[in-house]
């Protein structure tokens, strides 16, 4: 059994509301065990008899079920608990800096992650500090500027919606149960 973490994009914002209990019920209905939802921002941890080679099929299955049940254009990033733990531990910036947000951008496709890393390389590192990680991009924008920095605007492009989602480091710690 593998412990998976589903990170749903765009849940409980822009009119897309999914209650945690409904999300848990959906995942249990798909045959997953040990289902736990964390916070109300589209985070769920569960176990399934699917290893990492089956990730793409598992992702597609969950997205299809979300679309059918909640009638919205569902996108998720699916990581194992070990991958999430590694991404959290490797955060390269000062997570306790009160003036900045400690973000981790998860990418379900390597090409997308690479494109974000390449784009970030041309930006001002003071305004948009980023750092590449395994399957992720770390980002530490000033508080209150998430949507208006060049990197923030880049992340908001429609082309990245199906393959990326951003989480605060504190949320990731809660997902891991620490």
Spans of features found by a protein language model:
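Surface-exposed, charge/polar-rich loops and edge strands
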Residues: 2-178
């Amino acid at each position: 059994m593998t412990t998976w973490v589903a990170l749903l994009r765009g849940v409980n914002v822009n009119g897309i509301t999914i209650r945690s209990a409904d999300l848990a019920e959906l995942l249990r209905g798909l045959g997953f065990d040990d289902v736990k939802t964390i916070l109300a921002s589209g985070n769920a941890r569960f176990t399934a008899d699917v290893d990492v080679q089956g990730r793409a099929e598992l992702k597609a299955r969950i997205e299809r079920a979300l679309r059918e049940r909640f009638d919205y254009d569902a996108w998720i990033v699916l990581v194992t608990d070990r991958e999430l733990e590694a991404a959290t531990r490797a955060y390269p910036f000062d997570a306790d800096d009160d003036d900045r947000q400690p973000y981790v951008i998860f990418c379900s496709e390597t090409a997308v992650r690479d494109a974000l890393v390449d784009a970030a390389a041309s930006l001002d590192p003071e305004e948009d500090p980023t750092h590449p990680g395994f399957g992720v991009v770390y980002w530490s924008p000033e508080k209150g500027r998430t949507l208006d920095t060049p990197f923030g605007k880049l992340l908001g492009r429609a082309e990245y919606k199906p393959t990326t989602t951003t989480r605060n480091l504190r949320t990731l710690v809660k997902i891991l149960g620490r």
